[in-house]
Amino acid sequence: MIIATAGHVDHGKTTLLQAITGVNADRLPEEKKRGMTIDLGYAYWPQPDGRVPGFIDVPGHEKFLSNMLAGVGGIDHALLVVACDDGVMAQTREHLAILQLTGNPMLTVALTKADRVDEARVDEVERQVKEVLREYGFAEAKLFITAATEGRGMDALREHLLQLPEREHASQHSFRLAIDRAFTVKGAGLVVTGTALSGEVKVGDSLWLTGVNKPMRVRALHAQNQPTETANAGQRIALNIAGDAEKEQINRGDWLLADVPPEPFTRVIVELQTHTPLTQWQPLHIHHAASHVTGRVSLLEDNLAELVFDTPLWLADNDRLVLRDISARNTLAGARVVMLNPPRRGKRKPEYLQWLASLARAQSDADALSVHLERGAVNLADFAWARQLNGEGMRELLQQPGYIQAGYSLLNAPVAARWQRKILDTLATYHEQHRDEPGPGRERLRRMALPMEDEALVLLLIEKMRESGDIHSHHGWLHLPDHKAGFSEEQQAIWQKAEPLFGDEPWWVRDLAKETGTDEQAMRLTLRQAAQQGIITAIVKDRYYRNDRIVEFANMIRDLDQECGSTCAADFRDRLGVGRKLAIQILEYFDRIGFTRRRGNDHLLRDALLFPEK
């Protein structure tokens, strides 16, 4: 459990922590000299039962507020300190505002230096503090009157702090730690410290270090200042890491991550909680975990807005950010991440804003996935990063019925039905426009119907429609069940002359027309009708094989694929006993219809179900 102190400068935060834990959290010589916390200090309070509550002593001076903001990410509780001699001060209010804007952690209040004033002043400050607590939504906070130097109120405060519940951290989330310090230890090497926002880490794990963008191995761990083999979210962690990185390359705001991250984000949609109204395209200081950048805000509708960062940030859904004015003097608002990497255009369309509002209301990973699926296919890798879900978390999520998955893409049933309707409409239009053709191949149908959608999902839907009988297939050509063709009387007569001439070799239209004494265009239309009926197949325009020969060729390709792992033109030519040009025409036909796919000079078996096996 981590507890962050908060409060105005010189109100006794560090002294109070020393009285609780016996540790002086000021770690810099300048801090000890000035009696003022400048950077983050840490103190740990080991208990007989093995628990080790940890304290982050954050600076109270306005000048060092960015350091304070680096300390409040990922905390379970906060301890607000108000001196009885000063009462509520500027940073008291600002720290309360920041705590409110970073997720409302459970709050405890200590009134310090009670030995320096009379009881009337203590009562006055107590009333003052309760009023400001109500103002910022912390009316339920427990309040203790203390004097650290003489021990007043310390036993009751310690007992209360030990009874605070620890926040539950879900096991299905990936490990993510924001680095706030890096140093070297003689005999151990590089050590980084920070607060884990999610997940679990073990000695021996490989983690990705942003900044240097390299993998690092965890050699040793300390959690809450104790050596351990495993550490979890919500703990203060020191990691001894090994890899190709030096201390000087690591900065506050870098991350250690369980997985290789996507590119950091320059734009996000957020839900705002404002203390001071923001203006369109207002420049801001933006704080996230241990990171601090500048950027601007684009207001959308109600409390939704887009943040645009001058320096990209690694963010995830529901991450909290604090927005301060460009002079870095006033805290203006908090922001919760609703969507990563939004589209550059169309964000102000009413239907899109309505969808964003639904996404902002999502209470769980399952809710968020359901909302995303309303708009179309979801990339599972992107979603897993956004929600910081590990493999276990994603598997649990995908067990819900009604999802259609192909590779790393997911679709829900209503959108799949819309896509299938589009596929059928496209096929009907194709038949209307090409009455003398059997139909398009799978790839061509995909490109005509849904060219911008995920390829694997569209092909999977086409296959499901073929299996269900909504679409029929003849040797790679797809058509609607009622799309049938018949010969006219003239074509029937031509076909009766042409059919006996089809042996094992292919025919060109012009050669067959000449052989039978038929007009070339009439022969061309007749052979197209024969192809539409599944009797013959054109491997290229105007060159036809009997369909049983096409099936034989498909079986040859299967055999070569089993023997060699693929089919090349030379092997196929030798197996078939034809010229290289014809062999290539046949192989390219199989590529076009999706039975094979080309990779360099090889043709790999892609869809073995298109043709019956021998």
Swiss-Prot record:
It holds the Pfam family Beta-barrel_SelB. Residues 147-149 are annotated as: G5. Residues 112-115 are annotated as: G4. Residues 7-14 are annotated as: G1. It is found in: Cytoplasm. SUPFAM superfamilies: EF-Tu/eEF-1alpha/eIF2-gamma C-terminal domain (SSF50465), P-loop containing nucleoside triphosphate hydrolases (SSF52540), Translation proteins (SSF50447), Winged helix' DNA-binding domain (SSF46785). Residues 1-173 form the tr-type G domain. It comes from the Bacteria. GO terms for biological process: selenocysteine incorporation; selenocysteine metabolic process. The keyword Transport does not apply. Keywords: Cytoplasm, GTP-binding, Nucleotide-binding, Protein biosynthesis. One of its GO terms (cellular component) is cytoplasm. Belongs to the TRAFAC class translation factor GTPase superfamily. Classic translation factor GTPase family. SelB subfamily. This is Selenocysteine-specific elongation factor.
